[in-house]
Regions:
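Structural signal for hydrophobic packing residues in well-ordered secondary-structure cores
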Residues: 5-15, 19, 51, 55, ...
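Internal, active-site/partner-interface "lid" segment
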Residues: 107-108, 114, 141, 145-172, ...
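Structured C-terminal subdomain patch of bacterial secreted/periplasmic proteins
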Residues: 263-291
Length: 332
């Protein structure tokens, strides 16, 4: 909880450095690709939507292993808290040499530094927890300020999010659906991931081991929720909307018996509340939300070659354009 509670401070620090980071994140007219894995991929999605919203130019996003390196980009922004994620390093090493590379990390002196031209270092937002909370939100606070979007209210809303009541009594709910629109879709996916990371448990019975999901979460585009997923929720479901409510959705959700929550705070601050809910859910079940099973701080894979950027263009010229990154809403 200490890292969650520190977010007003880390956001304020990010806002203070925004002007200095515009040359890395907010150059007008460039064609930009943002990449990452897991939480960082969701933040890449939000960054891409925000940059286009600010009118600074075409911005794509992709999961690092699926990065369309055969396409022409002026700049690639790679997000990796640890700076050691293998798939991110491999994608960076495969880019044509003319592409400017930016690393967004919480740690300096890592392999990603050798593969990039510019570094956005958020070391004050680094975390001891395996599960990310303040690093991704601090990055998006920085992005919004660097892009020239309104941010005067952000720290105030983050402060309000910490003591705010949770939207429901978690003991009465076991299904959580998070919806977003535009840049907040990345937040919805991240909120759902926090439930899955923090509140799953292994049960062992006699000679047999099985996995039991004590709570489940999903995330979707807000306007797409009625195209199938709305049939799933019931009276123990919470449907949480980040940003404005899609017209008529309340009536559709109401028919299912589910509870719908539309936050009054900035969507980024609502994510702080969602983080708190995930921690509370884990605590209710006697779990450790900081160390979910099978997860580590960084995914480092053996057998994947990371080439120095000077040789990467030889292979990039023969690359195949990857498909558009899929929505993670129905995955996992």
């Amino acid at each position: 909880m200490q890292e969650i509670e520190s977010q007003p401070r880390t956001w304020a620090q990010a806002l203070d450095m925004a002007i200095a980071q515009r040359s890395a994140l907010a150059v007008p007219g460039e064609r930009v690709l943002a990449i990452g894995c897991g939480t960082s991929a969701f933040m890449a999605r939000s960054y891409a939507a925000l940059r286009e919203q600010a009118g600074l130019g075409e911005t794509d996003w992709a999961y690092a292993p699926e990065a369309p390196i055969g396409r022409r980009y002026d700049r690639v922004v790679a997000i990796s808290r640890s700076g050691t994620t293998t798939e991110v390093l491999e994608s960076l090493s495969s880019l044509p040499p003319r592409t400017r590379r930016v690393a967004v990390t919480a740690v300096s002196g890592k392999p990603i530094d050798d593969l990039t031209d510019d570094r956005v270092l958020l070391d004050f937002a680094d975390e001891t927890s395996v599960v990310q909370t303040r690093f991704p939100t601090t990055f998006l606070a920085l992005v919004r300020a660097a892009l020239g979007l309104p941010v005067d209210h952000l720290v105030r809303d983050a402060e309000a999010a910490l003591p705010a009541p949770l939207p429901v009594d978690i003991r009465d709910y076991n299904h959580f659906a998070y919806l977003g629109t535009g840049w907040t879709t990345g937040l919805a996916h991240e909120a759902a991931l926090k439930i899955r990371e923090a509140a799953l448990k292994i049960r062992e019975a006699a000679l047999k081991i099985r996995e039991a999901a004590q709570a489940w979460s999903e995330s979707y585009l807000g306007l797409d929720y009625r195209h199938g997923p709305v049939a799933v929720p019931g009276r123990r479901s919470l449907v949480w909307i980040f940003g404005p409510e899609p017209a008529g959705l309340a009536a559709s959700v109401g028919k299912s018996g589910a509870t719908m929550h539309v936050g009054a705070l900035d969507p980024l601050a609502e994510l702080v509340v969602a983080q708190r809910l995930a921690v509370a859910l884990a605590a209710e079940r006697g779990l450790d939300p900081d160390h979910p099973r099978l997860l580590t701080r960084s995914v480092v894979l053996s057998g994947m070659a990371v080439l120095p950027p000077t040789f990467a263009h030889v292979f990039a010229n023969h690359s195949t354009v990857a498909p558009t990154a899929p929505s993670p809403g129905a995955s996992l």
